[in-house]
Regions:
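Active-site neighborhood of divalent metal-dependent phosphoester bond hydrolases
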Residues: 56-114, 123, 141-154
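Active-site neighborhood of phospho(di)ester-bond hydrolases with catalytic His/Asp-centered motifs
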Residues: 7-9, 33-38, 42, 60-65, ...
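Acidic, His/Gly-rich catalytic cores of divalent-metal-dependent hydrolytic chemistry
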Residues: 174-284
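Metal-dependent catalytic neighborhoods of phosphoester/phosphodiester hydrolases
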Residues: 39-56, 71-81, 169-172
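Active-site environment of divalent metal-dependent phosphoester hydrolases
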Residues: 12-17, 41-44, 66-71, 159-171, ...
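N-terminal active-site segment of His-dependent metallophosphoesterases
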Residues: 1-56
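Beta-strand-turn-beta hairpins that frame and shape the catalytic cleft
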Residues: 1-6, 115-124, 172-176, 209-212
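Ligand/cofactor pocket segment of small-molecule handling proteins
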Residues: 127-180
Length: 284
């Protein structure tokens, strides 16, 4: 029996890109989907994005670091001193105004690691490391010993996301490692390789063998995605516009964040949000 699996990662709120990827995956004859986390933000996708995912036969899901940021914001773990924390809270406020709180219950339930066996082939599925969904341990240029952290004697193939780059390599003992790239915000270091396409991967397993690994880059209307973000009133829209048009996201530019926070009065919005989550969103 042949299993054709689409590996989806790092959607980051880009429902327009996700829709294009799903259409492409169906054309590829995919029978199931694995979801590697970082589902929401900084893009505007909320309930519309969830609706797309609910229609898919998803057989494995793990939680990413941006998913944890949403949960931490809802749990009141952030304050008003750090521009990145203010951004996370304002973006989470935007998200929760457009999404069923039941989605947060589902998000909390997702593990960091999931193991799957497909026709006798053993897979490890994580957003980043099996026990750590953040950090730079698995950047594509790192040494093999770093990637060995994904592997154990019961893993034939490890798949992970997080670094927003498609990757195919091996561990020191020969196990396969796959990164499908990012659907919503791919990263590029080399200018000539920049493009506006959504990335994902398709793997084919037949009779216990990994017979095909296909990296896909799918064109979509990124200007329509940007217009949708503007129509919805996405906070920090200036940063999203640069991401969509220039493939550059300045999430670590504290000066830029501080300027935008002051320009749009986001601190007051966040203060109101902090009051609201004490009773409305926080879940035990």
């Amino acid at each position: 029996m042949k299993h054709k699996i689409a590996i989806l990662s790092d959607i980051h709120g880009n429902a327009t890109a996700l829709e294009a990827v799903i259409a492409d995956a169906k054309n590829q004859g995919v029978s199931e989907y694995w979801l590697l986390g970082d589902i929401f933000l900084p893009g505007p996708g909320a309930s519309d994005l969830v609706a797309l995912l609910k229609d898919l036969p998803i057989t494995a899901s793990v939680r990413g670091n941006w998913d944890d940021c949403v949960l931490e914001a809802l749990d009141g773990e952030y304050g008003l001193e750090d521009p990145q924390e203010i951004q996370s809270m304002r973006m989470t406020q935007f998200l929760m105004e457009r999404m069923d709180p039941a989605t947060i219950v589902w998000l909390r339930s997702l593990p960091l690691l999931q193991k799957k066996e497909v026709a006798g082939l053993r897979f490890s599925i994580s957003h980043n490391l099996p026990d750590k969904n953040y950090g730079g341990d698995l950047l594509v240029g790192n040494d093999t010993e770093k990637f060995d952290q994904l592997l154990d004697e019961e893993t034939d193939v490890a798949v992970y996301g997080h670094v927003h780059k498609q990757l195919l390599r091996y561990g020191s003992q020969g196990q396969q490692i796959i990164n499908p790239g990012s659907i919503g915000m791919p990263y590029f270091n080399w200018e000539a390789l920049k493009n506006h396409r959504a990335q994902y991967a398709v793997i084919e397993v037949e009779d216990g063998e990994l017979v095909n690994i296909l990296f896909r880059k799918v064109a979509y209307d990124y200007e329509a995605e940007l217009e949708l973000a503007k129509f919805k009133g996405l906070p920090f829209i200036e940063m999203y516009e640069e991401l969509r048009r220039e493939d550059n996201y300045q999430g670590h530019n504290l000066k830029l964040l501080a300027n935008l926070i002051e320009k749009h009065g986001y601190v007051e919005d966040v203060k109101n949000f902090l009051e609201a989550i004490k009773s409305e969103y926080k879940m035990d």
